Regions:
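Polyampholytic low-complexity alpha-helical segments
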Residues: 1-324
């Protein structure tokens, strides 16, 4: 955002935010919103409302990330500045208390490096709000914090060596340099996904099925961002979504996965199967259904023929070099 190129920045955000679940990018977006809405010059309170909405938007999308701790801490600092006095008796004081308590409850349920610091803040917050009720609230949340803290330690071990790059790499051919390392990355991603599926945070049992699904969906989005050219990961993500009632997300995984890997037979068959199942729902006749199902296979064959032509052209060039 150097040179005050705000229109360009907003264009980048509109194109990339919802497709790139990266804490760094979302932090830049949040800083941009805060820069454009100065809280020091906010007589109407509109700027604070805009920033508050931005925090909600960011945390709803990447707040489950283990690297989102700094954003959560910044958010709590922002909430301390809203009108009202913790421990006060006015309606405004009570409103601020409820907002901050809800935010702390969300934060201490996320396995991240700052969870212990946030827990200490929460204890101080409840004590300053009401010493008589502080013990009750702290005891209620203590098991969640202990589970979260332990989960963070496990995730830290799982993430050791994991490449969460937003720049995807083509899988090296078997026997070529980097092939074994790439497969190791695939296994690390699978290990993280398996851990999330095992529900070590006890979310489903505690009635937090939506959070459980949100966490897994987020991990799958992270995985296909790095393993963009690994078809099996797209298929795994889609099938998990279909098994858990996330039809739209499952369809998006198959559509995006096939767009990224048009030469993948696996994705072509899975996508065609999806189209075949959806055709009756869309009221299509036999001919239209046949055309819809055929489209992925046409795309697959075109992509494979194109690859074949590229290989032949490369061989011809190499042959010319040898003859020279």
């Amino acid at each position: 955002m150097e040179g005050d190129q705000f229109n360009l920045a907003e264009s980048i955000f509109s194109r990339s935010l919802m497709t790139v679940p990266n804490v760094g990018l979302w932090t830049i977006y949040l800083n941009y919103v805060r820069r454009m809405n100065d809280l020091r010059n906010d007589a109407t309170g509109n700027n604070r409302t805009t920033v508050s909405q931005a925090y909600d938007f960011v945390l709803n999308n990447i707040g489950v990330d283990r690297d989102s701790g700094t954003i959560w801490q910044d958010y709590m600092e922002f909430l301390r500045g809203i009108p009202g006095q913790i421990g006060g008796t006015s309606w405004q004081d009570g409103q601020k208390l409820d907002i901050m308590r809800k935010a702390y409850h969300r934060a201490i349920a996320v396995p991240m490096s700052t969870v212990s610091a946030l827990w200490k803040e929460y204890e101080q917050f409840e004590t300053s709000a009401n010493k008589l009720t502080a013990r009750k609230y702290i005891q209620e949340r203590s098991p969640i914090y202990i589970t979260t803290r332990s989960a963070h330690q496990v995730l830290e071990h799982i993430h050791r060596g994991l490449d969460r790059s937003t720049i995807p790499k083509l899988p090296p051919k078997a026997g070529f340099e980097g092939h074994e390392e790439f497969l190791q990355q695939v296994e690390l991603w699978k290990k993280w996904i398996a851990w999330e599926q095992s529900d070590q945070l006890v979310l489903v049992k505690n009635g937090e099925s939506d959070v459980y699904k949100k966490r897994l969906l987020y991990v799958y989005k992270q995985a296909v961002m790095t393993l963009r050219f690994w078809p099996e990961m797209w298929v795994d993500a889609a099938e998990w979504c279909f098994d858990n009632g996330l039809e739209a997300d499952g369809t998006e995984f198959l559509t995006s996965g096939f767009a990224a890997n048009p030469e993948s037979c696996l994705l072509a068959f899975k996508y065609a199967d999806l189209l075949e199942k959806k055709s009756p729902e869309a009221g299509k006749g036999p001919k239209e259904r046949g055309e819809a199902v055929r489209a992925p296979f046409d795309k697959l064959l075109t992509s494979l023929y194109d690859l074949f032509k590229q290989v032949k052209a490369r061989e011809a060039k190499e042959l010319v070099k040898v003859e020279e």
